Protein backbone atom coordinates (compact mmCIF):
# COMPACT_ATOMS: atom_id res chain seq x y z
CA UNK A 1 0.00 0.00 0.00
CA UNK A 2 1.36 3.39 -0.99
CA UNK A 3 1.35 5.99 1.76
CA UNK A 4 1.87 9.69 1.12
CA UNK A 5 3.72 11.89 3.59
CA UNK A 6 3.86 15.69 3.45
CA UNK A 7 6.53 17.26 5.67
CA UNK A 8 6.33 21.03 6.09
CA UNK A 9 7.88 23.83 8.09
CA UNK A 10 5.76 26.44 9.85
CA UNK A 11 5.07 29.85 8.30
CA UNK A 12 7.12 32.96 8.97
CA UNK A 13 7.11 34.27 12.55
CA UNK A 14 8.11 37.67 13.90
CA UNK A 15 11.26 36.04 15.22
CA UNK A 16 12.11 34.64 11.75
CA UNK A 17 11.50 38.08 10.30
CA UNK A 18 13.84 39.66 12.87
CA UNK A 19 16.55 37.06 12.20
CA UNK A 20 16.39 35.62 15.72
CA UNK A 21 17.71 32.15 16.43
CA UNK A 22 15.32 30.75 18.99
CA UNK A 23 14.76 27.02 18.40
CA UNK A 24 12.21 25.86 20.96
CA UNK A 25 13.10 28.55 23.50
CA UNK A 26 9.97 30.62 23.01
CA UNK A 27 6.47 30.51 21.64
CA UNK A 28 6.36 32.40 18.36
CA UNK A 29 3.33 33.32 16.29
CA UNK A 30 2.85 33.68 12.56
CA UNK A 31 3.18 37.06 10.86
CA UNK A 32 0.64 38.18 8.27
CA UNK A 33 3.05 36.81 5.65
CA UNK A 34 3.27 33.55 7.60
CA UNK A 35 -0.51 33.26 7.55
CA UNK A 36 -0.52 33.96 3.80
CA UNK A 37 2.15 31.25 3.34
CA UNK A 38 0.03 28.75 5.31
CA UNK A 39 -2.99 29.56 3.13
CA UNK A 40 -0.90 28.97 -0.03
CA UNK A 41 0.32 25.69 1.44
CA UNK A 42 -3.34 24.85 2.02
CA UNK A 43 -4.04 25.35 -1.69
CA UNK A 44 -1.29 22.83 -2.49
CA UNK A 45 -2.58 20.34 0.10
CA UNK A 46 -6.26 20.78 -0.83
CA UNK A 47 -6.30 17.88 -3.30
CA UNK A 48 -3.98 15.61 -1.31
CA UNK A 49 -6.75 14.09 0.87
CA UNK A 50 -4.85 14.66 4.12
CA UNK A 51 -6.37 12.38 6.76
CA UNK A 52 -4.31 13.28 9.82
CA UNK A 53 -1.65 15.81 10.80
CA UNK A 54 1.16 15.25 13.27
CA UNK A 55 2.63 18.46 14.63
CA UNK A 56 5.18 19.93 16.93
CA UNK A 57 3.30 21.19 20.01
CA UNK A 58 4.70 24.69 19.45
CA UNK A 59 2.01 27.18 18.44
CA UNK A 60 3.65 28.25 15.16
CA UNK A 61 3.53 24.68 13.83
CA UNK A 62 -0.02 24.02 15.05
CA UNK A 63 -1.23 27.37 13.69
CA UNK A 64 0.32 26.60 10.28
CA UNK A 65 -1.27 23.13 10.24
CA UNK A 66 -4.71 24.47 11.19
CA UNK A 67 -4.62 27.10 8.44
CA UNK A 68 -3.13 24.81 5.79
CA UNK A 69 -5.46 21.87 6.40
CA UNK A 70 -8.48 24.11 7.05
CA UNK A 71 -10.69 21.24 8.17
CA UNK A 72 -11.76 20.86 11.82
CA UNK A 73 -12.55 17.18 11.20
CA UNK A 74 -8.89 16.37 10.51
CA UNK A 75 -7.14 15.54 13.74
CA UNK A 76 -3.91 17.34 14.62
CA UNK A 77 -1.84 15.14 16.92
CA UNK A 78 1.04 16.82 18.74
CA UNK A 79 4.27 14.99 19.44
CA UNK A 80 7.12 16.49 21.48
CA UNK A 81 9.65 14.67 19.30
CA UNK A 82 8.78 17.10 16.48
CA UNK A 83 10.03 20.13 18.45
CA UNK A 84 13.04 22.02 17.07
CA UNK A 85 16.37 21.67 18.87
CA UNK A 86 17.21 24.25 21.54
CA UNK A 87 19.40 27.26 20.83
CA UNK A 88 22.22 25.82 22.99
CA UNK A 89 22.30 22.74 20.77
CA UNK A 90 25.41 23.95 18.92
CA UNK A 91 27.51 24.80 22.00
CA UNK A 92 30.29 22.51 23.20
CA UNK A 93 33.10 20.56 21.61
CA UNK A 94 32.78 18.59 18.38
CA UNK A 95 32.06 15.26 20.08
CA UNK A 96 29.31 16.78 22.25
CA UNK A 97 27.72 18.47 19.26
CA UNK A 98 27.89 15.30 17.14
CA UNK A 99 26.24 13.31 19.93
CA UNK A 100 23.42 15.89 20.13
CA UNK A 101 23.01 15.80 16.34
CA UNK A 102 22.74 12.00 16.42
CA UNK A 103 20.36 12.05 19.40
CA UNK A 104 18.21 14.72 17.73
CA UNK A 105 18.06 12.77 14.46
CA UNK A 106 17.22 9.53 16.27
CA UNK A 107 14.43 11.29 18.21
CA UNK A 108 12.86 12.57 14.99
CA UNK A 109 13.40 9.28 13.15
CA UNK A 110 11.74 7.36 16.01
CA UNK A 111 8.72 9.66 15.75
CA UNK A 112 8.43 8.93 12.03
CA UNK A 113 8.89 5.21 12.70
CA UNK A 114 6.09 5.24 15.26
CA UNK A 115 3.77 7.08 12.86
CA UNK A 116 4.50 4.51 10.14
CA UNK A 117 3.97 1.58 12.52
CA UNK A 118 0.90 2.81 14.39
CA UNK A 119 -1.02 5.02 11.96
CA UNK A 120 -2.95 3.34 9.15
CA UNK A 121 -3.81 6.49 7.18
CA UNK A 122 -2.49 6.80 3.63
CA UNK A 123 -2.17 10.63 3.46
CA UNK A 124 -0.29 12.05 6.42
CA UNK A 125 1.05 15.56 7.00
CA UNK A 126 3.74 16.49 9.51
CA UNK A 127 3.99 20.14 10.60
CA UNK A 128 7.22 21.10 12.30
CA UNK A 129 10.32 23.26 12.00
CA UNK A 130 13.23 23.71 9.60
CA UNK A 131 15.67 21.35 11.30
CA UNK A 132 13.01 18.73 11.96
CA UNK A 133 11.75 18.85 8.36
CA UNK A 134 15.33 18.47 7.11
CA UNK A 135 15.83 15.46 9.42
CA UNK A 136 12.56 13.87 8.25
CA UNK A 137 13.67 14.24 4.62
CA UNK A 138 17.07 12.77 5.50
CA UNK A 139 15.38 9.82 7.24
CA UNK A 140 13.63 9.17 3.91
CA UNK A 141 16.90 9.25 1.98
CA UNK A 142 16.96 12.86 0.73
CA UNK A 143 19.47 15.45 1.87
CA UNK A 144 17.96 18.94 1.82
CA UNK A 145 19.61 22.27 2.39
CA UNK A 146 17.88 25.17 4.07
CA UNK A 147 14.15 24.68 4.54
CA UNK A 148 12.10 27.82 3.86
CA UNK A 149 9.01 28.81 5.81
CA UNK A 150 6.01 26.70 4.70
CA UNK A 151 8.08 24.68 2.27
CA UNK A 152 6.56 21.20 1.91
CA UNK A 153 8.17 17.93 0.81
CA UNK A 154 6.08 15.05 -0.56
CA UNK A 155 7.33 11.49 -0.12
CA UNK A 156 5.71 8.15 -0.90
CA UNK A 157 6.38 5.08 1.22
CA UNK A 158 5.69 1.91 -0.73
CA UNK A 159 6.67 -1.56 0.46
CA UNK A 160 9.21 -0.13 2.89
CA UNK A 161 10.91 2.07 0.28
CA UNK A 162 10.82 5.86 0.25
CA UNK A 163 10.46 7.87 -2.93
CA UNK A 164 10.79 11.65 -3.08
CA UNK A 165 7.94 12.96 -5.25
CA UNK A 166 8.14 16.74 -5.22
CA UNK A 167 8.31 19.83 -3.09
CA UNK A 168 6.15 22.90 -2.77
CA UNK A 169 7.25 26.46 -2.13
CA UNK A 170 4.55 29.06 -1.46
CA UNK A 171 6.11 31.57 -3.84
CA UNK A 172 5.50 34.24 -1.22
CA UNK A 173 8.81 36.00 -0.87
CA UNK A 174 9.52 37.12 2.66
CA UNK A 175 12.66 38.78 3.87
CA UNK A 176 13.94 37.24 7.06
CA UNK A 177 16.75 39.31 8.52
CA UNK A 178 18.92 36.18 8.82
CA UNK A 179 18.64 35.71 5.03
CA UNK A 180 20.14 39.13 4.27
CA UNK A 181 23.77 39.42 3.17
CA UNK A 182 26.07 40.51 5.99
Region roles according to the model:
Residues 4-8, 122-128:
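Beta-strand elements within well-structured catalytic alpha/beta cores of enzymes
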Residues 67, 135, 139:
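Active-site signature of alpha/beta-hydrolase-fold catalytic machinery across serine-
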Residues 10, 81-82:
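Active-site loop/turn elements of alpha/beta-hydrolase fold enzymes
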Residues 2-3, 44, 77-78, 84-96, ...:
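Acidic, low-complexity terminal tails and accessory targeting/binding regions
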Residues 95-119:
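Internal catalytic-core helix/loop-beta-alpha segment
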Residues 2-3, 8-72, 101, 147:
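Active-site-proximal alpha-helix that buttresses catalytic centers in soluble enzyme cores
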Residues 50, 120-122:
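Short, high-confidence coil segments that cap the C-terminus of an alpha-helix
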Residues 130-134:
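GST superfamily/GST-like fold recognition
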Amino acid sequence: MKRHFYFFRHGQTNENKAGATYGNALEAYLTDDGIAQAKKLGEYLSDKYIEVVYSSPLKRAIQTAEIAVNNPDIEIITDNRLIEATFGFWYGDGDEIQKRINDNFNRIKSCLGDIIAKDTHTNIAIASHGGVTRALCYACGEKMGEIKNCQCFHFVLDDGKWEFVDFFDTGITVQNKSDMPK
